[in-house]
Amino acid sequence: MANRPSFEQPVAYWTEELISPGGLIPFTNSYAFRDANTGLAFLYYWMTQILFHQCIESLHRAIYQPVIDAYPNMWPDLPFDLQIDLNRYQHGRMFAADICRGLDSVLHDTVQPDMLIMPMTVAMDLYRDINSVSQDGLMEIMWIDNFRSRLIEKGQHVAGVLQSQTWSEVATF
């Protein structure tokens, strides 16, 4: 009570980040896009980067899987130009965090919340994979579950607005 914020004594900057809508743990700085289409383009870019990196990793595992049965040399010798630098494809968690930082902004600006399901699902799957291996990413999973409820609420709101309109108004909408 003694530290209640007022005009003379504003909230300390470290607590303001926690109570502002953009300062939700574990993603403290939300992105704000120029418009919903720009935000959606970024979300889908980050989503495809995650999927592409996972594809490269699985190809790398398949190529370098030891061949024990028929060959005396169980590790394949690939030419230098076919060598893959796997460190270039280890940024999935960063891309998933970028998706989560942008989801709220795009949800606020869009009238098509269903377009956010795929990026949200890809980020959720990545964090679940991380959590199954290392018990990390639980806060991120909880944040995405919370976002899913906001996404459902926005979808129901848009559906309610469309159902309350007459068909001629929907056609011009």
Named regions from a protein language model:
Residues M1-F173:
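C-terminal effector modules of eukaryotic transcription factors
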